[in-house]
Amino acid sequence: MTLMKPRLSREMAEAIAAGSPVVALESTIITHGMPYPANLETALGVETVIRENGAIPATIAVVKGELRVGLEHDELEELAQSKGIVKASGRDLAVAMIRGQSAGTTVSATMLMADLAGIDVFATGGVGGVHRGAEQTFDISADLTELGRTKTAVVCAGVKSILDIAKTLEYLETQRVPVIAYGTEDFPAFFTRRSGFKADHRLDTPEEIAKAMWLHHQLGTGTGLLIANPIPEASALAPDFIDGTIADAVRDADERGIDRKELTPFLLARINELTKGESLKANIELVKNNARLAARIAVAYAPLKKARN
């Protein structure tokens, strides 16, 4: 079966055809993750970081019903300011296309579209996971199942402490997804460098990670890899402070009956309010840090992929 291909920007089409290093970027951080203009400034800043480290950024979104890989400045501006843009997971893409909607793509949708476009490395803030109480609610992010079926390396700062981190790591093991921590043995928890849990593996250079990616795919596993990159020490928030703040935000969400797709945007906004903007600053820095590592991995991986082909 011939699979659908997203529409590539000219720069993206040329880069992929040439085997140049490319890093995919999600768009829900623009449409639902941050307020304007911080969302646009962050998106442009992250793209700049990727270019400075030798790779080409590929921001991914649905634009008026069309799957798009590589966006122009005016398109990023529209995503950043428009109010009617939906949030699309992998399961939502077909309906968004039928309706001609514009959508910010979640981690799972971005992974899917990156894979269809032939992009191997993806930088994001954090991934979804297994929610606390999932044994009753079955609330498990599609990000985890997509990692188990899509050959994309996802560079992130771990998961937020609102999730059941132990069960998230167990679920990734079930999905045969290697969890590799960069420069540490600890699995990070987004705003903090340590979650109290260990990652499966530690690798200390982008070149090692790229080689692990190459060998992983040569084994025919068909799964992605999760690269856990701790937030820079200078930007990390105190664990007790942020854990208490997150607990307060979750309590507020429960009292207001907010759940499902609306939950994460609400929590991010509420946490930013409760921390007086400190969580937003940390979020921006960790995304840029992940983009930097992702670009270096993509640069190291590109010649390995060319040799394989």
From Swiss-Prot:
<dbReference type="InterPro" id="IPR022830">
    <property type="entry name" value="Indigdn_synthA-like"/>
</dbReference>
<keyword id="KW-0479">Metal-binding</keyword>
<comment type="subunit">
    <text>Homotrimer.</text>
</comment>
<dbReference type="GO" id="GO:0046872">
    <property type="term" value="F:metal ion binding"/>
</dbReference>
<protein>
    <recommendedName>
        <fullName>Pseudouridine-5'-phosphate glycosidase 2</fullName>
        <ecNumber>4.2.1.70</ecNumber>
    </recommendedName>
</protein>
<feature type="active site" description="Proton donor">
    <location>
        <position position="26"/>
    </location>
</feature>
<feature type="active site" description="Nucleophile">
    <location>
        <position position="160"/>
    </location>
</feature>
<keyword id="KW-0326">Glycosidase</keyword>
<keyword id="KW-0464">Manganese</keyword>
<dbReference type="GO" id="GO:0004730">
    <property type="term" value="F:pseudouridylate synthase activity"/>
</dbReference>
<keyword id="KW-0378">Hydrolase</keyword>
<keyword id="KW-0456">Lyase</keyword>
<dbReference type="GO" id="GO:0046113">
    <property type="term" value="P:nucleobase catabolic process"/>
</dbReference>
<dbReference type="GO" id="GO:0005737">
    <property type="term" value="C:cytoplasm"/>
</dbReference>
<dbReference type="Pfam" id="PF04227">
    <property type="entry name" value="Indigoidine_A"/>
</dbReference>
<comment type="function">
    <text>Catalyzes the reversible cleavage of pseudouridine 5'-phosphate (PsiMP) to ribose 5-phosphate and uracil. Functions biologically in the cleavage direction, as part of a pseudouridine degradation pathway.</text>
</comment>
<feature type="binding site">
    <location>
        <begin position="141"/>
        <end position="143"/>
    </location>
    <ligand>
        <name>substrate</name>
    </ligand>
</feature>
<comment type="similarity">
    <text>Belongs to the pseudouridine-5'-phosphate glycosidase family.</text>
</comment>
<dbReference type="InterPro" id="IPR007342">
    <property type="entry name" value="PsuG"/>
</dbReference>
<feature type="binding site">
    <location>
        <position position="139"/>
    </location>
    <ligand>
        <name>Mn(2+)</name>
    </ligand>
</feature>
<keyword id="KW-0614">Plasmid</keyword>
<feature type="binding site">
    <location>
        <position position="87"/>
    </location>
    <ligand>
        <name>substrate</name>
    </ligand>
</feature>
<dbReference type="GO" id="GO:0016798">
    <property type="term" value="F:hydrolase activity, acting on glycosyl bonds"/>
</dbReference>
<feature type="binding site">
    <location>
        <position position="107"/>
    </location>
    <ligand>
        <name>substrate</name>
    </ligand>
</feature>
